[in-house]
């Protein structure tokens, strides 16, 4: 049994948390996030420490308990520190560049792939083979990074494609001649 829901969430200096019925709004130095939570979960705030309580030990409530706590914790971390995902592009002629507010990726297709700017997400290209996705919403940062990776996922024979910086790509051996 997971005990994630029992851990308290520390609210750091400069982060303001507001509860309105089932909606939690977290405001911090990096921005503001709000999310509607399940009505069965009870949230208590005392001395800059937030705890989540469940009404019973039903399977559904146990699952929601940890999920609710993690969602709130991710919001608090997001508005105070932010989230970041790094990707690297491997392959001859594969590269990325910024053109105004667009990010253009050449990944071996007959056309370059253009990514529009999204509110609350910052896409940086420190080198033409690296992309960094930054933002305060963990879900959105992960989704955008996954969409970029999906443009050209790494292939197992030569390892060409777009991958996360810390991702390990399992390599396969090619066919051997008779």
Swiss-Prot record:
Entry keyword RNA-binding: yes
Record-linked Pfam families: Ribosomal_L6
Coiled-coil residue windows: none
GO MF annotations in UniProt: rRNA binding; structural constituent of ribosome
Keyword RNA-binding appears in the UniProt entry: yes
Annotated GO CC locations: cytosolic large ribosomal subunit
InterPro entries on file: Ribosomal_uL6-like, Ribosomal_uL6-like_a/b-dom_sf, Ribosomal_uL6_a/b-dom, Ribosomal_uL6_bac-type, Ribosomal_uL6_CS
GO-annotated biological processes: cytoplasmic translation
Domain of life: Bacteria
Keywords of the record: Ribonucleoprotein, Ribosomal protein, RNA-binding, rRNA-binding
Subunit structure, interactors included: Part of the 50S ribosomal subunit.
Family membership: Belongs to the universal ribosomal protein uL6 family.
Alphabetized NCBIfam families for the sequence: L6_bact
Entry function: This protein binds to the 23S rRNA, and is important in its secondary structure. It is located near the subunit interface in the base of the L7/L12 stalk, and near the tRNA binding site of the peptidyltransferase center.
Protein name: Large ribosomal subunit protein uL6
Lineage of producing organism: Bacteria, Bacillati, Bacillota, Bacilli, Bacillales
Gene: rplF
